[in-house]
Amino acid sequence: AFFHLAWAHTIGAGRNDMPAQIENIRYTIDAVRTAAAMGCRVFVGTGSQAEYGRVDGVLRADTPTNPENGYGMAKLCAGQMSRTEAAALGMDHVWARILSVYGPHDGPNTMISATIQKLLAGQCPDLTAGEQKWDYLYSADAADALYRMACHGRSGAVYPVGSGTARPLREYIETLRDAIDLALPLGLGKIPYGPQQVMFLQADITKLAADTGFAPRTAFADGIRATIAWAKTQKQTN
């Protein structure tokens, strides 16, 4: 199996850098051809919830796609083109539309990572009101989902990947804070929602579970403690 997770220009203005996003599509096709040349039988590509745009309901494989930025547009195109290329090369293809993943080794610019760093420094993080309903999946569980997709996924399938449950974002943030120090303040409501703020994000993992046997195993409280522990080791070495 070949797992393609690489992607450039994933944050900020880079998400609408159209020439750069087109290069990401090209790299995905290159990855398919490389996988075939290596003798791989299945190509597992990682897409994004950004392929859907803003949706009020639970995300399924057949939920209409209406991406609102170049990143989401390119992910959608890469999934479609790589599926066609894989078929032409006689290779199975599975596409994961990943929602929000957290865990050790996460990038510093995610909301989870930035909030952890602020709280570990004893500072009050500036946040939105946290009313968004969100679906978070621990990184080890996400890796398990991709592995199961390679082993048991249906060729040509698209699988939304998440925990399958949604909670208000402020609840996740409060759980995170409580794992560090109950007394630390949170700046909930200090940042306004952006013009394209997604207010509901939840994956329907019914098909993923049926086809592959996947089930999330890590509660957020446990996963965030492991993430904080890792962040503390990074703070000590820097």
Question: Residue locations for each model-derived region?
Answer:
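Conserved Rossmann-fold NAD(P)-dependent oxidoreductase catalytic core, especially the SDR/UDP-sugar
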Residues: H4, I29-G70
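Structural signature of the Rossmann-like NAD(P)-dependent dehydrogenase/reductase core
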Residues: H4, V42-G45, G53, V94-S100, ...
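Conserved catalytic-core motifs of eukaryotic protein kinase domains, centered on the activation segment
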Residues: G12-P19, R54-L59, G107-P108, G130
